[in-house]
Amino acid sequence: MADYYDLLGVGRDADADTLKRAYRSKARKYHPDINKEPGAEDRFKEIGRAYEVLSDPQTRARYDQFGEAGLGGAAGASDMGDMGGFADLFETFFQGFGGPGGAAAGRSGRRGPQQGDDLRYDLTIDFEQAVFGQEQEIKIPHLETCDTCGGSGAKAGSGPTTCGTCGGAGQVRRATRTPFGSFTQVAECPNCGGTGQVIADPCNACGGQGVRQVRKKLRINIPAGVDTGTRLRVSGEGNAGQRGGPSGDLYVFLTVKSHPRLRRDGLNILSTVNVSYLQAILGDTIEVETVDGDTVLEIPPGTQPGTVLTLANKGIPKLGNPVARGDQRVQVMVQLPTRLSDPERTLLEELAGHHSARGKQHHHHNSGLFARLFGQK
């Protein structure tokens, strides 16, 4: 599923009212009774799921930290009954037009502080790191507030001045005539970019941008139980904001390397072990590899090829609750010899004779079976 914030078309700092308005607008757009296009109903359900998760502070916090992996089925399908009125739809449609009743009426166009962009960092970790978690150092390139000008973008002793194009409003207005009447369209000032200010004497260190790109070392905590696709959020380590706005966040996307002998299946670990046919028949105690180190495994007498034995609590810790762990399931592979020595063959034929309930006839039958099995005549 797509990112929940993207589905609703809101930023990650959106408050409850913003989320609600966005949900109503999107839900109406994709409601199956209104939108008959293929895929509209699926998108309608996705939007409902996104709103249900993000409107609850606890599930939103888990989603922000771990993505969908952190939800663990905590939220179900959303009730779509509350569509709300048409006010938000009309507000969205008329946003940007002035005049009586227009959505832009009384709204300041000058840009204030803006939050910095979020950043993505892809990190590959070992299988054992994913199981037990670890603190790891990474280096990221990101924008930080310029320490020379303090983020103002201007040289020392100078500062921003009011934009002469928009008079400091950050917006310019343009009259448009339509069959429905005249409208005044409000657009961002092209000279100042909506800030209402221009910098006549820019800072040499940052070129008037107020930010500089640097490489920064971070130590991030990888929790136990993560998997490929898990997303970790590092608050405030994205790009620096503009005009005193807060920094964005850093999102670390994990990829887990495969293990040569162990394989993950949910919270369980799968592995195989080879035993001889005598160990399978008589039983034995062996050591097998686990993420906790070599562990003793009992092979019961009469173990059949393909039997799966369980090592309890040797699996993957549950993300967010590392005390709960899965199991390791060990499939027993019985190795048969391709050739037998004469004494081995004699002993096996004697065993086959004793085991047969039909005497000599069965003895000859089993003898032929061993010959075919081990390639001897």
Swiss-Prot record:
Domain J: 3-67
SUPFAM superfamilies (UniProt xref): Chaperone J-domain, DnaJ/Hsp40 cysteine-rich domain, HSP40/DnaJ peptide-binding domain
Cellular component aspect of the GO annotation: cytoplasm
Keyword Metal-binding included in the entry's annotation: yes
CXXCXGXG motif repeats: 146-153, 163-170, 189-196, 203-210
Gene Ontology molecular function: ATP binding; heat shock protein binding; unfolded protein binding; zinc ion binding
Cofactor(s) required, per the database record: Zn(2+)
Zn finger residue spans: CR-type: 133-215
Keyword RNA-binding in annotation: no
Gene3D superfamilies recorded: DnaJ domain, Heat shock protein DnaJ, cysteine-rich domain, Urease metallochaperone UreE, N-terminal domain
Superkingdom, taxonomy of origin: Bacteria
Cofactor note as given: Binds 2 Zn(2+) ions per monomer.
Principal location class: cytoplasm
A Pfam family the protein falls into: DnaJ_CXXCXGXG
CDD domains, A to Z: DnaJ (cd06257), DnaJ_C (cd10747), DnaJ_zf (cd10719)
InterPro entries per the UniProt record, alphabetical: DnaJ, DnaJ_C, DnaJ_domain, DnaJ_domain_CS, HSP40/DnaJ_pept-bd, HSP_DnaJ_Cys-rich_dom, HSP_DnaJ_Cys-rich_dom_sf, J_dom_sf
Annotated Zn(2+) 1 binding sites: 146, 149, 203, 206
One record GO biological process: protein refolding
SMART domains for this protein: DnaJ
Keywords for the protein's UniProt record, in alphabetical order: Chaperone, Cytoplasm, DNA replication, Metal-binding, Repeat, Stress response, Zinc, Zinc-finger
UniProt function note: Participates actively in the response to hyperosmotic and heat shock by preventing the aggregation of stress-denatured proteins and by disaggregating proteins, also in an autonomous, DnaK-independent fashion. Unfolded proteins bind initially to DnaJ; upon interaction with the DnaJ-bound protein, DnaK hydrolyzes its bound ATP, resulting in the formation of a stable complex. GrpE releases ADP from DnaK; ATP binding to DnaK triggers the release of the substrate protein, thus completing the reaction cycle.
Similarity field: Belongs to the DnaJ family.
Quaternary state and interactors: Homodimer.
PANTHER family: CHAPERONE PROTEIN DNAJ A6, CHLOROPLASTIC (PTHR43096:SF10), DNAJ HOMOLOG 1, MITOCHONDRIAL-RELATED (PTHR43096)
Domain notes: The J domain is necessary and sufficient to stimulate DnaK ATPase activity. Zinc center 1 plays an important role in the autonomous, DnaK-independent chaperone activity of DnaJ. Zinc center 2 is essential for interaction with DnaK and for DnaJ activity.
Name by which UniProt lists this protein: Chaperone protein DnaJ
Species: Parasynechococcus marenigrum (strain WH8102)
Chain's gene name: dnaJ
